[in-house]
């Protein structure tokens, strides 16, 4: 892996705190002049770290670069897991379909060590937990590769091992999803709603392992 410029890391961390803001608002929050921020953004857009558009957005390249640093920091501070909390909500019915596909099922068995129940438990995160979910967006996780069945191509899925109460499972983060950003999907060898007696609206806390 090539060396990462320390100045670049500082710039990306600063910009991550103002994502979604206009240049004027971001410059004020970062205590920079508009001209200075425009100059920085031009350079980072040229290098592929920042997306084009009126609002400041990091590209996947920018997020991946921050993810490398975040992983090192988590290891340095011996942070092995995070806890997210929220309420159980009904899904769109997609989880049952995707978890029943042989391509995903076999990959999950190989990568995570269990056969997934054909369905997911959906949790709508509390606002503080949504912030911490961004850590997961930046970390590599466990890759469940995409595949094609000859008729359709299915995208890759990022996973993290997790524990809900006493049940070991994982959260899955598909490349393509119709869920809002404050919803996570949990898979396990069992139907979690049934074995844990969960209903819509029930509060839950899930521990997610970062390694």
Swiss-Prot record:
The record lists FMN as bound by 177, 185
Query: Which GO terms fall under biological process for this protein?
Result: FMN biosynthetic process; riboflavin biosynthetic process
Q: Which cofactor does it need?
A: Mg(2+)
How cofactor binds (record note)? Binds 1 Mg(2+) ion per subunit.
Positions annotated to bind Mg(2+): 120, 122
Q: Where is the stretch described as H-T-H motif-like?
A: 1-81
Cite the InterPro entries for this sequence. Answer: RibK_CTP-dep (IPR039063), Riboflavin_kinase_archaeal (IPR023470), Riboflavin_kinase_CTP-dep (IPR023602), Riboflavin_kinase_dom_sf (IPR023465), WH-like_DNA-bd_sf (IPR036388), WH_DNA-bd_sf (IPR036390)
Which residues participate in CDP binding? 91-96, 190-193
Query: Which keywords fit this entry according to its UniProt record?
Result: Flavoprotein, FMN, Kinase, Magnesium, Metal-binding, Nucleotide-binding, Transferase
Catalytic activity from the UniProt record: riboflavin + CTP = CDP + FMN + H(+)
**Pathway of this protein?**
Cofactor biosynthesis; FMN biosynthesis; FMN from riboflavin (CTP route): step 1/1
GO MF annotations in UniProt: magnesium ion binding; nucleotide binding; riboflavin kinase activity
One Pfam entry for this protein is CTP-dep_RFKase
Q: State the top-level EC class.
A: transferase
Q: What Enzyme Commission number does this protein have?
A: 2.7.1.161
List every stretch annotated Riboflavin kinase: 82-211
- Family, per entry: Belongs to the archaeal riboflavin kinase family.
Q: Which PANTHER family match?
A: RIBOFLAVIN KINASE
Instruction: Please give the HAMAP family that the UniProt record associates with this protein.
Output: Riboflavin_kinase (MF_01285)
Its biological function? Catalyzes the CTP-dependent phosphorylation of riboflavin (vitamin B2) to form flavin mononucleotide (FMN).
**What's the protein here called?**
Riboflavin kinase
Q: Which organism is it from?
A: Pyrobaculum islandicum (strain DSM 4184 / JCM 9189 / GEO3)
């Amino acid at each position: 892996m090539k060396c990462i410029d320390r100045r670049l890391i500082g710039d990306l961390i600063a910009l991550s705190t103002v994502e979604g803001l206009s240049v004027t608002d971001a410059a004020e929050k970062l205590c920079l002049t508009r001209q200075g921020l425009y100059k920085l953004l031009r350079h980072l857009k040229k290098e592929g770290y920042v997306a084009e558009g009126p609002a400041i957005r990091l590209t996947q390249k920018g997020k991946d670069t921050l993810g490398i640093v975040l992983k090192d920091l988590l290891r340095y501070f011996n942070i092995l897991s995070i806890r997210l909390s929220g309420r159980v909500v009904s899904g769109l019915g997609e989880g049952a379909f995707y978890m029943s596909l042989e391509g995903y099922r076999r990959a999950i068995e190989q990568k995570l060590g269990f056969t997934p129940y054909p369905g997911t438990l959906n949790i709508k995160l509390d606002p503080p937990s949504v912030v911490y979910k961004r850590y997961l967006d930046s970390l590599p996780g466990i890759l469940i590769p995409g595949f094609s069945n000859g008729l359709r191509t299915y995208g890759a899925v990022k996973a993290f091992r997790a524990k809900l109460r006493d049940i070991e499972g994982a959260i899955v983060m598909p490349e393509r999803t119709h869920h809002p950003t404050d919803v996570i999907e949990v898979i396990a060898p069992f139907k979690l709603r049934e074995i844990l007696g969960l209903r819509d609206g029930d509060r839950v806390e899930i521990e997610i392992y970062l390694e």
